[in-house]
């Protein structure tokens, strides 16, 4: 057992000695490099030398885009490379040591900051170590969570896309002191934001369409001042509108459809129609308030969804106005309003045929003349009309009464005539007719009075029915008009969003895709 532990102890002591020796070499190298080293001085052998600083941005997470604050929050890794002639060494002098890890606060830094931050945090999240190679080149990859400003265009919200950027510049050095440039790989400049598929977390609201990078010179800032040169990383992102479609647009469309369906209520139910339309209007106001809390408070543009909600509110208000007008027309009567001939022709003949509506046909002219004769009457008290006219004007009960009355008189005359032309019987017959004449006349007058009253009531009911039919036709016309307006307006507004697509190329007029070449 003791013999098996001997080799293990020997290997452990050998590894400890080698580690201590290697650590001693790093300590010795670090002590040699940091001797008389000043991290505040620019690493230039001559004053005219320019230090080249390369930048590369790796995006790990697009956290959020706050539309109201116009702030983009991202989680990134900033890769910076530069060379410091004071940190060179010969690996042979340090037993082949090729990489030295040095705290970033101990070496000179190019003072690169995010120029368009919104929270005042210019520094990285963690000052990790830098990697120094024997030729003095430094590689630094600190992580950072940045909140950068992003101008929001709300014109097509929620079917919009935004162009955000992260602007990096040196806070203290001008173009004559350092030269900012994009990192290179295989002789090609990395003109895009690098995304590692294994480390990147997809955002649930935004999709990245383009991610170019550019080196820009600010024409406003003089070249001898800091901030003249900038490295800008762009993010062209498109919103995923499913959340707003499901939670705002679809419920609003369904609620607005209820306002359209109130036309299926009777024309006289104007009060119920106005109540339903008012409730729909209140619901649309709530949706508009929810949208207003999401978008920035700007007067430069009106969001597309706000335009649509306003359009639906206008349609609902028009429906309320239509309901009031239809109710006013439906409750008219011949005593208050006389129907013009043109109104009767358009709303009772022409439009019902076009709309395939079933309305009661208008009475023929012969019946109208008979009604006038019945109202005027004759001097003898009998209405001057034919049998066909009477059949068309009088109700069935009055026709039966009049028929029995006529049959009784004829039957009495026939009975008197059957007994022969005796003088006595003729005189008795004439006397009986003379005695019965006032009673018959009173009966006839009473029948004519009842007929006139019945006719007046029938005329009044017919007038009410005509106004009600006009209201029905007007209600149907308004329904078709509002339905067409609702469909066309909805389709037109959302077709505007369909044509608002992210361009195929990130910069107009520049044919380069700013993406890595395919393998």
UniProtKB/Swiss-Prot annotation:
SUPFAM superfamilies: Neurotransmitter-gated ion-channel transmembrane pore, Nicotinic receptor ligand binding domain-like. It is found in: Postsynaptic cell membrane; Cell membrane. Glycans are attached at residues 52, 163. It catalyses: K(+)(in) = K(+)(out); Na(+)(in) = Na(+)(out). It is a multi-pass membrane protein. Keywords: Cell membrane, Disulfide bond, Glycoprotein, Ion channel, Ion transport, Ligand-gated ion channel, Membrane, Postsynaptic cell membrane, Receptor, Signal, Synapse, Transmembrane, Transmembrane helix, Transport. Residues 330-476 are cytoplasmic. Pfam families: Neur_chan_LBD (PF02931), Neur_chan_memb (PF02932). Its main location: membrane. Gene3D superfamilies: Neurotransmitter-gated ion-channel ligand-binding domain, Neurotransmitter-gated ion-channel transmembrane domain. Residues 1-22 form the signal peptide. One of its GO terms (biological process) is monoatomic ion transmembrane transport. PANTHER family: NEUROTRANSMITTER GATED ION CHANNEL. Belongs to the ligand-gated ion channel (TC 1.A.9) family. Acetylcholine receptor (TC 1.A.9.1) subfamily. Gamma/CHRNG sub-subfamily. Pentamer of two alpha chains, and one each of the beta, delta, and gamma (in immature muscle) or epsilon (in mature muscle) chains. This is Acetylcholine receptor subunit gamma. The gene is Chrng.
């Amino acid at each position: 057992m003791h013999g098996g532990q001997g080799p293990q102890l020997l290997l452990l002591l050998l590894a400890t000695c080698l580690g201590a020796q290697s650590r001693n070499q790093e300590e010795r190298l670090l002590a040699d490099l940091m001797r008389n080293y000043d991290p505040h001085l620019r690493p230039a052998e001559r004053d005219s030398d320019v230090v080249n600083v390369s930048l590369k941005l790796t995006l790990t997470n697009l956290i959020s885009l706050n539309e109201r604050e116009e702030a983009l929050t991202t989680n990134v890794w900033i890769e910076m490379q530069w060379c410091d002639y004071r940190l060179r060494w010969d690996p042979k002098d340090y037993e082949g040591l090729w990489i030295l890890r040095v705290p970033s606060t101990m070496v000179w830094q190019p003072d690169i900051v995010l120029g368009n931050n919104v929270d005042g945090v210019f520094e990285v999240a963690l000052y990790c170590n830098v990697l120094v190679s024997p030729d003095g080149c430094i590689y630094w990859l600190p992580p950072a969570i940045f909140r950068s400003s992003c101008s929001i265009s709300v014109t097509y919200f929620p079917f919009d896309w935004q162009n955000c950027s992260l602007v990096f510049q040196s806070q203290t050095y001008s173009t004559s002191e350092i030269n900012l440039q994009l990192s290179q790989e295989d002789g090609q400049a990395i003109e895009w934001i690098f995304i590692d598929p294994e480390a990147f977390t997809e955002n649930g609201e935004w999709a990245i369409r383009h991610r170019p990078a550019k080196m820009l010179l600010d024409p406003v800032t003089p070249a001898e001042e800091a901030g003249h040169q900038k490295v800008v990383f762009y993010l062209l992102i498109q919103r995923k509108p499913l959340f707003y479609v499901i939670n705002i647009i679809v419920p609003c469309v369904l609620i607005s459809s209820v306002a359209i369906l109130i036309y299926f209520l009777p024309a006289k139910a104007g009060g119920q129609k106005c109540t339903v339309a008012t409730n729909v209007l209140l619901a649309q106001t709530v949706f508009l308030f929810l949208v207003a809390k999401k978008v920035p408070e700007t007067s430069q543009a009106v969001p597309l969804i706000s335009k649509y909600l306003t359009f639906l509110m206008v349609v609902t208000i028009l429906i309320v106005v239509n309901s009031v007008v239809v109710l006013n027309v439906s409750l008219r009567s011949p005593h208050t309003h006389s129907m013009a001939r043109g109104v009767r022709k358009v709303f009772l003949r022409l439009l019902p045929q076009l709309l395939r509506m079933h309305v009661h046909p208008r009475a023929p002219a012969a019946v109208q003349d008979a009604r006038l004769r019945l109202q005027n009457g004759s001097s003898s008290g009998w209405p001057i009309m034919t049998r066909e006219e009477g059949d068309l004007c009088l109700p069935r009960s009055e026709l039966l009464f009049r028929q029995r009355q006529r049959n009784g008189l004829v039957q009495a005359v026939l009975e008197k005539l059957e007994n022969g032309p005796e003088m006595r019987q003729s005189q008795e017959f004439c006397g009986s007719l003379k005695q019965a004449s006032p009673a018959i006349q009173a009966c006839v007058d009473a029948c004519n009075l009842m007929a006139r009253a019945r006719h007046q009531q029938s005329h009044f009911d017919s007038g009410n029915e005509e106004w009600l039919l006009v209201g029905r036709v007007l209600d149907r016309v308004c329904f078709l008009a509002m339905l067409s307006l609702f469909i066309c307006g909805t389709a037109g507004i959302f077709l505007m969003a369909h044509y608002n697509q992210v361009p195929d190329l990130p910069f107009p007029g520049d044919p380069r895709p700013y993406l890595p070449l395919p393998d």
